[in-house]
Amino acid sequence: MKKILIALLVCFSFVTANAKDYSKYYQNLPVQMQQPTLPSIPDNHVSILECGGNGDGLTMNTQAFAKAISKLNKMGGGHLNVPAGIYLTGLISLKDNIDLHLEKNAIIVLSEDKNDHFKIDKTTGKKENRATPAINASKRKNISITGEGTIDGNGEWWRPVKRSKVSDVEWKEFQSMGGTLNEKGDIWYPFNLKHKPNVAENMDEQEKTRTHMIRFTSCENVLVQGVTLLNSPKFHIIPTRCKNVIIDGITVKCPWNAQNGDAIDISSCKDVLIVNNVIDAGDDGICMKGGAGAAGVAAGPCENINIQDNTVYHAHGGFVIGSEFSGGMKNIVVRNNTFQGTDTGLRFKSAVKRGGTSENIYIDHIYMTDIKDAAITFETTYFDNHVGAKKQTAPVKQEFLPNFQDIHMSDIYVRGCETGIEAHGAEGMVHDITIKNSNIFYTKEAKDIDATCKIQLENVRFESFAK
């Protein structure tokens, strides 16, 4: 009897992180999906203040976070509580069974000093070549970031800026930080800043060190819930090769012109739920990736992805597949989402050496207003126009071709877009696509679809202003 009581106490000492019933999102789906498993977090609590943390906006808290995580790890895991305050920090590396919990008015601010964001190579003793995502975990189980607080990525200290994307006043503000212009004088780099050191020998090499705000790699049972992610140096959150991921009720916001300012990117993950999020991003809103070439194939597909009840304001695309998806896309449901003011709504982009095959993609009840370009677009010659990029003119080996197929859309409602449906690609790259029971109000062109692209329309109504 005593042994049974002890076992019960152990069981009850674990709490499923912010337990919430997500079963409603798995009813009446067009494909069978496994509902993600929530992380199980022990009911232990450690405050960052207990471990030397200070939310005065001046004190570096990197060691305090590390100490708190180590303390919880020795206890078998638990909740790292961050109370109201401003906590300047470098890297935060989560371990098994740990919840990083930000209370209301708690703000984690990533240090402006780039040196604070590099790990040291244990073999060479030297700084690694690329910065580590500020909040990171690798091969961990049962991890979460929850609460009502904010994580501020201080991205302007990392990102290059194109002159064409800022006002005269903004351009002067960036130059007042110091920095370096390219030869043409139309791109500003945060290199040779007035108050912070460089981490590379030149601006191009330093740009290669820029990385994401949150990245979980090969992790299982992941929850990100309630927090605000602000102004990342690159992507805001990118789970990669993870299983059982839930992203629920977060807000993601960065300047509309933030270079590579993707909000939520999912890369080669399985069993993922993305719900109730609000996004205003500088690049893609909710994006599915699957790696490029052989590496993408090895990583595997994005599989069993459920995306519902999200709102995307500015973004290059509301929901996006690509550009790299050589590992494939399989069993994806996108339902009851709103896109307002995005460049494109539903965007499928890829290119030779980046492409893969899509299977069982179902999209329905999407509501769009004020879409700048095309409401629905397929692009198979995508060029990654990152800062300093140059288009390749030499012949490219025809491998890992895009194969957008088995994509089914219905109840798509659009009030305001330049082009309704746009599709370009060689024979066999865009086929077996259906769009049904939809209304699209456009301003320039209803359809711009190559003859090689096989898209079947049924009960799709196009309207525009009277001419």
Please state what every model-predicted region is.
Residues 86, 241-243, 251, 270, ...:
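Active-site-proximal loop/turn and secondary-structure-junction residues that shape catalytic pockets
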Residues 104-105, 141-149, 220-230, 243-255, ...:
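Right-handed parallel beta-helix
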Residues 54-56, 293-297, 327-328, 354:
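Short, small-residue-enriched loops and turns at beta-alpha junctions
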Residues 77, 91, 111-112, 154-158, ...:
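Short glycine/acidic-rich loop motifs that flank beta-strands on beta-rich extracellular proteins
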Residues 325, 336, 345-467:
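Extracellular beta-rich repeat passengers
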Residues 2-81, 86-99, 103-218, 223-225, ...:
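Extracellular "leader-to-stem" segments immediately downstream of a signal peptide or signal-anchor
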Residues 82-89, 263-265, 351-352:
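Conserved short loop/turn motifs at secondary-structure junctions
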